Swiss-Prot record:
Belongs to the universal ribosomal protein uL6 family. One of its GO terms (molecular function) is rRNA binding. This is Large ribosomal subunit protein uL6. One of its GO terms (biological process) is cytoplasmic translation. The lineage of its organism: Bacteria, Pseudomonadati, Pseudomonadota, Gammaproteobacteria, Pseudomonadales. Pfam families: Ribosomal_L6. It comes from Pseudomonas syringae pv. syringae (strain B728a). Disulfide bonds: none annotated.
Length: 177
């Protein structure tokens, strides 16, 4: 069995889990998430925890059990606490402003960039150069943060661009004459 799948997923108070066929739905204070469980993985619902068992012992099935456990753990954490990513804008005139479901970005282009946020994702701008992306789906929060970063990645000479708050940009030295 996968070492990851051996550990059960503990359900905090206020989180409900429903298993109908191969569809697992997790409901919590922040919302509801659903996942189709792979047919080779069996989910055992016990008192206050979930266990994941591979139906047969081959390597691929054990790996799928571990992957499923990690995905469900992220779902449980998302509906109870939520996820967030912080982005920073570095550069002269780089600004961000959140208006409802649209994030307006000024990134040094000749035009402003308007990014439409998907359902379940919220963006805040505590300052003009900071963006806070929140949601219950870990994959979607990371995907939105990556798409915003891709508008203007940090460049290695001056470090200008959109970067994750914890990202360290490797700097290059300018060309010498």
């Amino acid at each position: 069995m996968s070492r990851v799948a051996k550990n059960p997923v503990k359900l905090p108070s206020g989180v409900e889990v429903k298993l109908v066929g191969q569809l697992l739905s997790v409901k919590g204070a922040k919302g509801t998430l659903e996942l189709n469980i792979h047919s080779s993985v069996e989910v055992v619902v016990e008192a206050g925890e979930l266990r994941f068992v591979a139906r047969n012992g081959d390597q691929q099935t054990r790996a799928m059990a571990g992957t499923t456990r990690a995905l469900v753990n992220n779902m449980v954490q998302g509906v109870s606490q939520g996820f967030e990513r912080k982005l920073q804008l570095v550069g002269v005139g780089y600004k961000a402003q959140a208006k409802g479901t649209v994030l307006n970005l000024a990134l040094g282009f000749s035009h402003p960039v308007d990014y439409e946020l998907p359902n379940g994702i919220t963006a805040e701008t505590p300052s003009q150069t900071d963006i806070l992306i929140r949601g219950i789906d870990k994959q979607l929060v990371g995907q939105v943060a990556a798409e915003i970063r891709d508008f203007r990645r940090p460049e290695p000479y001056k470090g200008k661009g959109v970067r994750y708050a914890d990202e360290v940009v490797r700097r290059k030295e300018a060309k010498k004459k």
